[in-house]
Amino acid sequence: MTLVGDLAKGIVAVLLSKGICELLGTGLTAQNDVHFIGYIAGIFAILGHVFPIYYHFKGGKGVLVGVSVFLGIDWKVFLCLIVIFAVVLVISKYVSLGSIIAAACCPVVTFLFQFWQRGDLPMWYLWLNTGLAALMGAWVIYMHRTNIQRLKAGNENKFSFHSKKA
């Protein structure tokens, strides 16, 4: 249930922000509002997840919320990030390493997909969205700082489908 709730946070933030912009007649076109406004909404969704008021500002790391923002913005970016995460997880057996590397790839993947499909949008807009994606990815990496320390020390827990027997 937590998985579904975390995934819904990012998607709902993007879709709701897009709907509000359309209702208010902001002048943003259907082609670009979902990206720029989606990234802004996504950043706030991640911050709300990481620093929830009702848990005394101690929340999650923002991975699922962050990746679901990309699902709401561009499913191809989402799919690419999931594949990157899965490949790293299968090779290394570290969920945290997969999350960190996928987060680090956010700006690159965002830039490439938006560059290929940008049409007549100016390059500054592409760089703005890439910067916002980088901010989201950097925040997720920052939230994994204890995992990074454990990875360096060699005592991070590996992922397994099998439970450990006592």
Task: Give the residues covered by each predicted segment.
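Hydrophobic alpha-helical transmembrane segments
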Residues: 35-43, 67, 79-83, 96, ...
